[in-house]
């Protein structure tokens, strides 16, 4: 018996954020650690984050690489640190992001390329990796923070609290044998009840992402992707009677 569920599919992922606070020496300018000056406490924190020009990148192993636009929306320069990680978001993936470290001026953008350095991926389905970029704030003595006129831009952005933000998007390795798009086959996912959980079976070679999933008008939370040729279980809404429709 198969379950009637309503699912809205999307191939996009919002950025995964990791925030780290960096306390500058300016916060302790007057009176030491326990006696911060009024001017120091009035300084606002700034976030060093970057805007990516896409929510995902599809990589064809037969291509020469894929590009992604990196945008600095801030009014000050920052270093951009980039890397490609495996599905666990911990170990390095066999990709080279060129260049892995570069400066981006305020209100400026540039296109960067990811290139495969080898590795073995299945030929009959998508594989998922992660592209991560991190904005690094300048310090007062960083020469790269100088403007074109030689002015120290770092002095203007030296804050008592600086937030360095890392944003990650999906990199799908899609082999030539996998034709079509995920949107074209998303309706093929089969939904079943497994105890007090909802089971989605993905018979396609694509990663299927769910933006919304409802059962009987109630939203199913903790939505996650369903990997190719696999299944995933989701908690059913509490107190809801599940009705089946057989096919």
Curated annotation (Swiss-Prot):
Keywords: Chaperone, Immunoglobulin domain, Periplasm, Signal. GO terms for cellular component: outer membrane-bounded periplasmic space. Residues 106-125 are annotated as: Disordered. InterPro entries: Ig-like_fold, PapD-like_sf, Periplasmic_pilus_chap, Pili_assmbl_chap_C_dom_sf, Pili_assmbl_chaperone_bac, Pili_assmbl_chaperone_C, Pili_assmbl_chaperone_CS, Pili_assmbl_chaperone_N. Disulfide bonds: none annotated. PROSITE patterns: PILI_CHAPERONE (PS00635). The keyword Lipid metabolism does not apply. It is found in: Periplasm. One of its GO terms (biological process) is chaperone-mediated protein folding. Its main location: periplasm. Residues 1-29 form the signal peptide. Pfam families: PapD_C (PF02753), PapD_N (PF00345). Involved in the biogenesis of the NFA-I adhesin. Belongs to the periplasmic pilus chaperone family. This is Chaperone protein NfaE. The lineage of its organism: Bacteria, Pseudomonadati, Pseudomonadota, Gammaproteobacteria, Enterobacterales.
